[in-house]
Regions:
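ABC-type nucleotide-binding domain
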Residues: 3-259
């Protein structure tokens, strides 16, 4: 189907969650390309991960997908429809963003999960149970009505993450963006976080940025970025067999790198 410019911003539903980048090249300053000819397809319900050193382009891919920046070269499609045709509302509501350091605001635990949306108490509770946040919330003096201080400073980083997971699930997104969601977690909460993430990803298309390769070994596809280009792709096992950049990164993290 051909889409005309006057249809921009009119599509207000993400049906399946297929994602495609076609020949996307992007520069923040118009001089230096931070992404060069990026091509990939993610089928509905799949998890793909992007790995690479700082500045390799991982975050830029997410920035473009979330429409934080406009790109001039190439196409980004959701369900074979150019991303410009989707309304900002549907992109905001149906793409769940899980950040490294989730933002909690002054209010109650429930209002932080609800996030200004018309979500019933029962749904707030169901979302919390789904991500295993219910247990610690129930133990708070006022439970879901417990006050949250600015930035949620009274909670551990793991608890903040679980509240953010509940917030994401309550909105029932079609697509998840995970930005190193386990970077700042105390080890005892790590297992709960990993289990919850797996449940959240189930049936949803997921784009994950990872620094720790141990967290993305089960991804359907891993893309290795270097200086704005995808230099390797495959499953964890396939990439190890290639003995390329991913293999080196994995060896380094596993602490087996020989001097």
């Amino acid at each position: 189907t051909d889409y005309e410019p006057e249809q921009f911003g009119k599509v207000n539903e993400i049906k399946n969650g297929k994602i495609e980048f076609k020949n996307v090249t992007f520069s923040y300053d118009g001089k230096r390309n931070v992404l060069k000819n990026i091509n990939f397809v993610v089928n509905p319900g799949e998890t793909v991960a992007f790995v690479g050193s700082t500045g390799s382009g991982k975050s830029s891919i997410m920035n473009l997908f979330l429409r934080f920046y406009d790109f001039k070269e190439g196409e980004i499609l959701i369900d074979d429809i150019p991303i410009q045709h989707y309304s900002q509302e549907v992109l905001r509501d149906k793409i769940g963003l899980v950040l490294q350091d989730p933002f909690l605001f002054h209010g109650t635990v429930a209002s932080n999960i609800r996030m200004y949306q018309d979500i019933k108490d029962e749904e707030v509770k169901q979302a919390s149970e789904f991500v295993d946040a219910h247990h610690f919330i129930e133990q708070l003096p006022q439970g879901y009505d417990n006050k949250v201080s600015e930035k949620g400073s009274t909670f551990s980083s793991g608890e903040r993450q679980l509240i953010a997971f509940a917030r994401t699930i309550a909105a029932n997104p079609k697509i998840l963006i995970l930005d190193e969601a386990t970077a700042n977690i105390d080890s005892q909460t790590e297992e709960v976080i990993q289990t919850s993430l797996k449940k959240m990803r189930n049936g949803r298309t997921t784009l994950a940025i990872a620094h720790r390769l141990s967290t993305i070994q089960d991804a359907n596809q891993i893309f290795v970025l270097d200086k704005g280009e995808i230099v390797e792709s495959g499953t964890h096992t396939e990439l190890l067999e290639k003995e390329g950049l991913y293999y080196k990164m994995y060896q380094l993290q596993a602490g087996m790198m020989q001097e």
